[in-house]
């Protein structure tokens, strides 16, 4: 089986700043969320966990799986989508004509911002990870957990559900929510 989980809350989540690849750690609420999720989902078996190397995801995985003996591996293909020059911007939705907003409102019309990542790049790297790392293990009967980020997780969820780009954000999950994909 394959499960996916979004990291716990950070201070930047709380003030609506775009995090992207900026390495923001969990805050106390995020750590508590990860511990509570660990209790809530304690009956789900995992053989291995793959996490984004960014601190907020890796720490979520470690707290969530504490005491379960599940190895946590990081992989660069699981980092969050790059938001370029808009990382760290607070409340981008309030900025009139801010180009990053089309990413969230009309993803099919999104034009990659300076220093950012395109949907094609995101889907290529996460798809490669799923095809080359995860599926061979799932096909051998292993239960795998991926701990990542909003957009990165949505790309994997879209791959499994066949979601068109205009519905990309339909796969968005809450912080520390676990979703079974297969």
Give the residues covered by each predicted segment.
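Extreme N-terminal starter segment of soluble prokaryotic enzymes
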Residues: 1-3, 48
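Generic beta-sheet signal
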Residues: 2, 140-150
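Active-site-proximal alpha-helix that buttresses catalytic centers in soluble enzyme cores
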Residues: 9-70
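Glycine-rich phosphate-binding loop signature in dinucleotide/nucleotide-binding domains
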Residues: 42-45, 133-142
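Short beta-strand scaffold positions
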Residues: 51-52, 124, 147-148
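Domain-level recognition of soluble alpha/beta enzyme cores
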Residues: 161-182
């Amino acid at each position: 089986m394959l499960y996916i989980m979004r990291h716990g809350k950070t201070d930047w989540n709380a003030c609506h700043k775009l995090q992207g690849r900026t390495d923001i750690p969990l805050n106390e609420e995020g750590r508590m969320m990860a511990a509570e999720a660990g209790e809530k989902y304690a009956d789900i078996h995992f053989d291995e966990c793959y996490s984004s190397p960014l601190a907020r995801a890796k720490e979520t995985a470690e707290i969530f799986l504490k005491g379960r003996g599940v190895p946590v591996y990081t992989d660069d293909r699981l980092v969050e989508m790059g938001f370029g020059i808009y990382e760290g911007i607070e409340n981008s939705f309030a900025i009139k004509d801010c180009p990053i907003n089309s990413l969230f409102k009309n993803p099919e019309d999104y034009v990659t911002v300076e220093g950012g990542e395109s949907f094609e790049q995101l889907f290529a790297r996460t798809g490669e990870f799923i095809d080359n790392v995860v599926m061979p293990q799932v096909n051998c009967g292993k239960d795998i957990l991926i701990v990542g980020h909003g957009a990165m997780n949505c790309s994997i969820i879209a791959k499994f559900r066949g979601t068109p780009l205009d519905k990309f954000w339909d796969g968005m999950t809450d912080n520390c929510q676990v979703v079974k994909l297969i």
